[in-house]
């Protein structure tokens, strides 16, 4: 049975882990790094780059380098958070046919699920390379505060990447699993998870292998990206004051600012000041302009103070829902790269009244927890029971647009709940069930997850028909809803899919595209390797010809020259087979050069030995000696 892997699909970075000898192990990628940037790029020549190679070329290819795509997953174009992002990223966010937020690639529009799938493919390949076997199943993490549409879109991404997603698990819960795997004592912990694009806080009770989430809260549009943007805004404003040029309207400059902002933010976690130095950032009629601004830690903290404060309100709500006070928390586990910021650690300590626990790697702990959950599902990890919750209340729209809750937030999942409703008008033969998720009292203020019709209700006075609505949330936090007319037994049900979202046909097509691209990528890689091999062989042969060409018989030299010419003719082409054949032909022809080289070396070695022997004879000194017998030696 193939291994089930755990993947932390992050906003900024992603990470993959697997269980080995009862412990989670984070796997290094092909670059030898344990985390991979969640960045995907499409180059001018049609190549698709993922991870560090994509991030490295972002400055020269800002329109088609996609980062922080997780902030768009499962969202509509009219979502206020999407509108905010449109102004802040250099790539184009465009509407799909169903008004979902997608991105514009070079050749077509891509859904955030597709872009995320490319990162998941990289994680899958990383695991396969390490394990030496095919990987087909995974546990993938999402922010605890992700709604149904976002969870479904993440599951779709896994499917497009060729993975069967056995479970979607909340990031703070995964972190708690990794933190508490070997801890026997009973504890109440808070997981404070501030990542690249999202913030979550979860309160859990752990002990004897049981991990029970008591409450969760968060903000799916608060993370490191927002901190970076504050620095970008500040640098752009300072530059404009001095030079009268708005760098934000220049995509290239904006990308350079973003990279430098991220670097400054990281440096200022340990240093007290950082010199932002960007030569030739732009130019005007007077010539090139350079940006040179000193940023202190104090200034950075002032710029992001309100963002740090925004993390505390969800903490209050989570504790209130759990019926606890800050002093009831035994340990605070910090997750996400942003928790390295001293100001964030200060805020956590101030709120909970104690120093946070720093025994876990904030960048890797979520993937490790996902691997543990994968081990549980595979049967490799025993005596671990995970009880998670739904982050938001679920209900339907009733008369007057009121949001009627069927399942309250922080209800343990999986769960099932039914409630009976009736008609609003006389002789009503159909009802529309509008399913929403959120905490507001009016349905219109909450997130509409989907709607469906129950038809064929016998005409009756209003209030008489009995329609039973059932909500069923699975362990992934994904919702199924059914409505049944008790009189006729007629039933209608749907697996909730956002009014946009990807249909099964869309996903199937994307899976096919991904598979086709995987083949194309493989061929492209083989072609690049063949080009490189041909270049290396040509260079090596020409160098050897210069040194030893005169020692090779004429006909052999002609054969080598002919093979060289033939390889040069095809080496830059697209015919992989021809390049490989001609390279091999040159390898065979060049063997004569190798023979000549060895013959020359042997001749030189023999001459050197002969010379050494001759010189040795010249240095011989004649000496007289007399033999002393043993008896004389004893007398001496």
UniProtKB/Swiss-Prot annotation:
Region entry Disordered, spans: 600-636
PROSITE patterns, per database record: HSP70_1 (PS00297), HSP70_2 (PS00329), HSP70_3 (PS01036)
Residues recorded as bearing Phosphothreonine in the entry: 198
Induction behaviour: By stress conditions e.g. heat shock.
Biased composition (Acidic residues): 615-629
An annotated Gene Ontology molecular function: unfolded protein binding
Alphabetical list of InterPro entries matching this protein: ATPase_NBD (IPR043129), Chaperone_DnaK (IPR012725), Heat_shock_70_CS (IPR018181), HSP70_C_sf (IPR029048), HSP70_peptide-bd_sf (IPR029047), Hsp_70_fam (IPR013126)
Keyword annotations of the record: ATP-binding, Chaperone, Nucleotide-binding, Phosphoprotein, Stress response
Summary of the function given for this chain in its UniProt record: Acts as a chaperone.
Homology family: Belongs to the heat shock protein 70 family.
PANTHER family: HEAT SHOCK PROTEIN 70KDA (PTHR19375)
Matches recorded under NCBIfam families: PRK00290.1, PRK05183.1, prok_dnaK
Full protein name: Chaperone protein DnaK
Gene: dnaK
């Amino acid at each position: 049975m193939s291994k089930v892997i755990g993947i932390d699909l992050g906003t900024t970075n992603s990470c993959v882990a697997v269980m080995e000898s009862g412990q989670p192990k984070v796997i290094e990628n092909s670059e030898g790094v344990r985390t991979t940037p969640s960045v995907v790029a499409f180059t001018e020549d049609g190549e698709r780059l993922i991870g560090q190679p994509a991030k490295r070329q972002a400055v020269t290819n800002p329109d088609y380098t996609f980062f922080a795509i997780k902030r768009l997953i499962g969202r509509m174009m009219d979502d206020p958070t999407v509108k905010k992002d449109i102004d802040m990223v250099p790539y184009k966010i465009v509407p799909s046919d169903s008004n979902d937020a997608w991105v514009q690639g070079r050749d077509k529009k891509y859904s955030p699920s597709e872009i995320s799938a490319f990162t998941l493919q990289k994680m899958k390949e990383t695991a396969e390379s390490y394990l030496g076997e095919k990987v087909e199943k995974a546990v993938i993490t999402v922010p605890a505060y992700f709604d149904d549409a976002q969870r479904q879109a993440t599951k779709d991404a896994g499917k497009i990447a060729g993975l069967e997603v056995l479970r979607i698990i909340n990031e703070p819960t995964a972190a708690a699993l990794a933190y508490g795997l070997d801890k026997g004592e009973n504890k109440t912990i808070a997981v404070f998870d501030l990542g690249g694009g999202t913030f979550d806080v979860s309160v859990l009770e752990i002990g004897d292998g049981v991990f029970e989430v008591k409450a969760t809260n968060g903000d799916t549009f608060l993370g490191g990206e927002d901190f970076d943007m504050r620095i970008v805004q500040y640098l752009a404003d300072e530059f404009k004051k001095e030079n009268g040029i708005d760098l934000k309207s220049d995509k290239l400059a904006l990308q350079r600012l973003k990279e430098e902002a991220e670097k400054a933010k990281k440096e200022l976690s340990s240093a007290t000041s950082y010199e932002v130095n960007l030569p030739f950032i732009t130019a005007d009629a007077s010539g090139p302009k350079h940006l040179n601004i000193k940023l202190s830690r104090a200034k950075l903290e002032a710029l992001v103070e309100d963002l740090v404060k925004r993390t505390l309100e969800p903490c209050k709500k989570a504790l209130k829902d759990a019926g606890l006070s800050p002093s009831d928390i035994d340990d605070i586990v910090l997750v996400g790269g942003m928790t390295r910021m001293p100001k964030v650690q200060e805020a956590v300590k101030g709120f909970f009244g104690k120093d946070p626990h720093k025994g876990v790697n904030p960048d890797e702990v979520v993937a490790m927890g996902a691997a543990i959950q994968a081990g549980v599902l595979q049967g490799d990890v025993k005596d671990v029971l995970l009880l998670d919750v739904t982050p938001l209340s679920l209900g339907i729209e009733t008369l007057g647009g009121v949001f009627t809750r069927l399942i309250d937030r922080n209800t343990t999942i999986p769960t099932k709940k039914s409630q009976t409703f009736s008609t609003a008008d006389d002789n009503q033969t159909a009802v529309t069930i509008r399913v929403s998720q959120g905490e507001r009292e009016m349905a219109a203020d909450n997130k509409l997850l989907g709607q469906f019709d129950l038809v064929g209700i016998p005409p009756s006075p209003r209030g008489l028909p009995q329609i039973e609505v059932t909500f069923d949330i699975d362990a992934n936090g994904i919702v199924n809803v059914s409505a049944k007319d008790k009189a006729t037994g007629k039933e209608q049900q749907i697996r909730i899919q956002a009014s946009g979202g990807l249909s099964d046909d869309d996903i199937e097509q994307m899976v096919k595209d991904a598979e086709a691209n995987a083949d194309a990528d493989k061929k492209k890689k083989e072609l690049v390797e063949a080009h490189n091999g041909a270049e290396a062989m040509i260079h090596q042969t020409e160098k050897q010809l210069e040194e030893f060409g005169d020692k090779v018989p004429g006909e052999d030299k002609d054969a080598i020259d002919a093979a060289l010419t033939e390889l040069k003719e095809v080496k830059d082409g697209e015919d992989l087979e021809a390049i490989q054949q001609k390279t091999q032909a040159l390898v065979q022809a060049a063997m004569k050069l190798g023979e000549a080289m060895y013959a020359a070396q042997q001749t030189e070695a023999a001459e050197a030995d002969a010379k050494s022997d001759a010189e040795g004879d010249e240095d011989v000194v004649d000496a007289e000696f007399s033999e002393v017998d043993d008896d004389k030696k004893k007398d001496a």
